[in-house]
A protein has these predicted regions:
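Peripheral terminal and linker regions in Fe-S/redox and tRNA-modifying enzymes
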Residues: 1-334
Length: 334
């Protein structure tokens, strides 16, 4: 959470790991906003949800209640691993290499275990990309896993925007997805050993290359940390792949905000509100529309856009109608 400029007002950031917001979490946000009269809700570029203008009592109660609904607020600000990001249409996007969402969620759980471990960067962003579109911008974050056509990942590290921006360094290719946590820890450990925490403006992994003496020396440090970690720990993850089994209703739909999924007959609807700040009544209208739809969930993207996925054509039409008044349609409004 963060203190706001106004006296006695705070913002609480809710992790939506990999941008996944199932219907029960959407309902929690709607119910909480009504209960505490929350005036501003914001979808962030890190695919999280921010609740603004909270009093101290509401802040503490919401943090505790969120945990009961599978929503983690710990480490969402400050010197911590931030919300793990992912291509928002992973698993349903036409042309994707493979569904990276399960790996992003596993990485998000693992990243939480790194809190308070050693000297840490001011932010640590773990990102997954599922297709050549690279919708999550995995190539310029602290560590990015970019899907390949062979079902493996290329790994980029020490990228970032802000002052002195830089693209990530391609640290390894054809990495087995079960090994992603080794790389997340190795990059974290590299910063712990070589990062600059004395200067807050430079306490980011994108400065590691120069601190290590150049790209090649930096790579050597990361590779050595990888080798050491593999000797000491077993960080292998085991994912049971799941597939969308829902089928279409025999009809089709087209439109500017309609995205045909790779599952025949199913669609996603894009919903971008002004500034990525939906009103409470707009969120409630969306929830009431989709609450009984099978296998439907909301995905948040890095442009503060929401996507409602796994809709039949008739369901998609209802979601379009429910979001018509609140959705922006021009590039300028985006």
């Amino acid at each position: 959470c963060y203190a706001q400029r106004e006296d006695d007002k705070c913002m609480l950031r809710l992790r939506m790991t990999a941008g996944s917001m199932p219907k029960d979490k959407l309902k929690f946000i709607v119910d909480s906003a009504k209960k505490y009269h929350i005036s501003k809700i914001h979808f962030t570029t890190c695919q999280a949800v921010q609740l603004h203008n909270l009093g101290y009592k509401a802040l503490t109660e919401l943090a505790e209640a969120g945990y009961d609904h599978g929503i983690i607020t710990r480490g969402t600000g400050g010197d911590n691993p931030r919300n793990t990001m992912c291509s928002p249409l992973s698993g349903v996007e036409k042309g994707e290499y493979f569904d990276v969402m399960p790996y992003a969620k596993a990485a998000g759980e693992y990243a939480l275990t790194l809190i308070h471990q050693g000297k840490i960067p001011r932010k640590y962003k773990v990102v997954f990309s599922n297709s050549p579109k690279n919708a999550s911008h995995a190539t310029f974050h602290d560590i990015g896993f970019v899907a390949r056509s062979d079902g493996k990942f290329d790994v980029y590290t020490s990228g970032g925007l802000g002052p002195n921006p830089r693209m990530g360094v391609l640290i390894d290719t054809a990495v087995d997805p079960k090994d992603i946590c080794y790389y997340i820890y190795a990059q974290w450990k590299t910063f712990s050993e070589h990062g600059n925490c004395q200067n807050r403006g430079r306490a980011r992994t994108r400065y590691l290359i120069e601190l290590c003496g150049g790209e090649e020396e930096y790579k050597k440090v990361v590779y050595q940390n990888l080798a050491d970690i593999r000797k000491r720990e077993d960080l292998t993850i085991h994912i049971q792949p799941s597939a969308v089994t829902k089928t279409g209703d025999g009809t089709t739909i087209e439109g500017d905000r309609v995205i045909a999924q790779k599952q025949e007959g199913l669609y996603a609807i894009e919903w971008h509100t002004v500034g990525g700040c939906p009103q409470v009544d707009e969120l409630e209208k969306l929830y009431e529309t989709i609450k009984d739809f099978e296998d439907v969930e909301v995905r948040l993207g890095s442009y503060e856009t929401a996507y409602i996925i796994n809709l039949t054509a008739s369901e998609a039409k209802k979601v379009l109608e429910a979001t018509e008044d609140s959705a922006v349609v021009s590039e300028f409004e985006h």
